[in-house]
Amino acid sequence: MAKNEHLRSVFDWIQIQFDKTEFSPKEIIEDILFLDFDLFIENKGSLKYYNYDSQLHYGNIRIYYGSKESSYMLVMSGQALEFYRDMILDPNSLSERQFLDNLYYNYNRFSIRRIDIAIDDFNETPYFTPNQLLKICQKKRFIYGKSTYYNTYGDETIGQTLYLRKPNDDERLRIYDKRLERAEKLGISKRYIENWIRTELELRKEKAHYFIQEWLYSEIDLLNFTKGYLKEKVRFYSDSHFSKPLRSWEKFLGHSKPVSIIISKPKTELEQKLEWFTYKGSGAILKAYKFLYDNNLLHEYEKANYLALNNMEYPPDLASGLIERAILFKREDLIPTIKENIKRRN
């Protein structure tokens, strides 16, 4: 019978983007990675989807850069992270949590662009195999958020991988037999490698950044936090009515508390302007102006200027923001008034 004590969770990919105006390669290497800058070798290097043309690398730890990009990109693959844990973090009694906490607590102008988090099942009889879950998917008895897309790669001989959600989605789940993968890679029989089923969550862009942020805020270990996220997002069922959760998946997730990641939406242009006016612009002057007017402390020409504020017209971009706000609050009746007060270009 599968037991939770034979599960472990590790990061299998971490990719972080740093703004050039706030960071230097030396600072990334020495203050964030806790490494010696002289260990890194400079070489040519490129990264898909970006215009980097150079890299600094130490083993598989890589920092990409280039004159056409305004950032540096730290990429740590599974091999790089295994090396980093064994050779840098563990000898210094540090963890990946402390490494990331140092980054989030002490720095700004960076973003996590991708993380892969693996849950490894080393049970002699695993909670499930990729093929078992594939049969559930083929019957359309699963849902991942709002998606029911799945795909597979390989077979049971070389190792089968089950993918949930599309390749271009910001999050994806992979379930595969790590033992078969390693046996194939090493050219040895699988009987020489322990049983090993890997469930791997891949998050990109804002989802990756906010997942790490919420995990650091919590007091939950990576295994249970990741299981909690999967409990909230991914469901398998043993019946076509979606009324009976698949027992093996439920047991795998155990008593983990469901985790929901809320991504803050960027402020609209109107919100940014109002915030700037209040805290960095002329908000205090407007308040003073009103105080002087209400208490009859203005000269006549100043009164005329104050009253003229009500007759000012909106620049087109500001008017556009006002119309969007009126629609948001279901006050479409105000749109004609806004349009009547748009400043016309000469």
Residue ranges and their predicted role:
Residues 273:
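Residues in the recognition helix of alpha-helical DNA-binding motifs
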Residues 1-268, 276-346:
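Structured, helix-rich domain cores that form ligand/interaction pockets
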